[in-house]
Structures are given as structure tokens and as C-alpha cells.
């Protein structure tokens, strides 16, 4: 039986765009995390008054990361689909830990580039820096995830607006945007992660 092709995937993007939550949700929805593990993480998140962080805590395992609600170091976690075997590399978005992001990106074949679609967020400082770093490090395969669509009421206009901003940014750096897929999601609520969301019928 032939082995599945393997890809190292790093999450990238601004701090608080929802990268760790997205990784946790992908792992849960693909069966790489059991319900029992998620239940325990939810209890920890509640104790720390971080009620929506259970998916992020799948990868954010260090006490300081959980207390501060942000990723500090890189973390690896495997998962597989019917056709592919992946190693997800969760990387920090905060500017103080950009060296750790570079370490993770140097191990990656492609990136899930996460941008918040929440009104008032969108393209931010580390969004730009991470995009530039990925290009410099030779990562030309991007999947752009526009997260927090629930905070934008799943509005197509908001998706198109942030997509246009991201397109301008990535083209300016030298990416072939025609080859990049843009996906609207709500990582925390699991919309458009493992299956198509009925909240965004406008997206094909």
C-alpha cells in the first residue's frame, strides 16, 4: 500500500487572528482529538476565565501560554485525511515571538495564512510581517483563511472586503494570488472547516 504524501503546514498571521483555535478545530473535526480531551481543555479554559480557548489549548500547552491567551513557542501535531498526511505547526503571531515563527516557517512546505474578518481587525501589523517572512523563506503555497466570520454575521461583503485587502498585500509581496484559495470560516464554531457551512451559502 503506497504511503500518503506528507506536508508540513504552518499557521501564520496576526496575534489573535485565531490560528491556534483553527488548528484545534481542524484536529477535532478530523478525529485527531477525542471528545474527552476537548472536554478537559474546556474545563481548564473555564478555570482560567478563557471560556472560548479550549481549541487553542490543544496546541497552547505551556502554563504561560494558557494564562496569557497567546502562543509563544511552536508546536507540532500530526493529522491525516484520506489522501494526505499533515504535520500542523502552530506558530505565534505576537511580534515578541517572531523568531519562533521563523523557526516554524523554516520547517514548513506551505502555510495556512489566517486573517480575522471581524470588523475593525482584518489586515494588521503582523499580518503584513508574516506574509513577507513567508515569501522570504520560500513558502509559496498559501491557503488564506478569513476567520471570525461569525463576528461579521457571515456577511459576503465583509469577506470580499478583507479578501481584496489581502489580495493587494500578497500581490505586492510577489505571490500569484490567482493560485491562492481564500476560505471564509468561523474556527471556533466549526463553520466551513471539515464541511461546507450553511451559514455562508454564497461561498462556493
List each model region and its residues:
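P-loop NTPase switch module centered on the Walker A-proximal segment
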Residues: 2-99, 108-111, 115-118
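Conserved Switch II/interswitch segment of TRAFAC-class P-loop GTPases
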Residues: 6, 84-87, 91-97, 106-131, ...
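Flexible glycine-/small-residue-rich
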Residues: 11-13, 146, 184
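Acidic/polar active-site rim loop that often engages polyanionic ligands
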Residues: 20-23, 142-149, 190-193
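Alpha-helical scaffold elements adjacent to nucleotide-binding pockets in ATP/GTP-utilizing enzyme cores
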Residues: 22-26, 37-40, 100, 129-133, ...
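Canonical P-loop GTPase G-domain recognition
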Residues: 152-204
Amino acid at each position: 500500500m503506497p504511503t500518503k504524501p506528507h506536508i508540513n503546514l504552518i499557521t501564520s498571521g496576526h496575534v489573535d487572528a485565531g490560528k491556534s483555535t483553527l488548528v484545534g478545530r481542524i484536529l477535532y473535526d478530523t478525529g485527531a482529538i477525542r471528545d474527552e480531551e476537548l472536554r478537559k481543555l474546556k474545563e481548564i479554559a473555564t478555570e482560567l476565565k478563557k471560556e472560548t480557548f479550549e481549541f487553542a489549548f490543544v496546541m497552547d500547552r505551556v502554563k504561560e501560554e494558557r494564562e496569557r491567551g497567546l502562543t509563544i513557542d511552536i508546536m507540532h501535531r500530526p493529522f491525516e485525511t484520506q489522501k494526505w498526511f499533515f504535520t500542523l505547526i502552530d506558530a505565534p503571531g505576537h511580534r515578541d515571538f517572531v523568531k519562533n515563527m521563523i523557526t516554524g516557517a523554516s520547517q514548513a512546505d506551505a502555510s495556512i495564512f489566517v486573517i480575522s474578518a471581524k470588523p475593525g481587525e482584518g489586515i494588521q501589523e503582523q499580518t503584513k510581517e508574516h506574509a513577507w517572512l513567508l515569501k522570504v523563506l520560500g513558502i509559496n503555497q498559501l491557503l488564506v483563511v478569513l476567520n471570525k466570520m461569525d463576528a461579521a454575521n457571515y456577511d459576503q461583503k465583509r469577506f470580499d472586503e478583507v479578501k481584496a485587502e489581502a489580495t493587494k498585500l500578497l500581490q505586492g509581496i510577489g505571490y500569484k494570488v490567482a493560485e491562492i484559495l481564500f476560505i471564509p470560516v468561523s474556527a471556533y464554531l466549526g463553520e466551513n472547516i471539515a464541511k461546507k457551512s450553511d451559514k455562508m451559502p454564497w461561498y462556493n
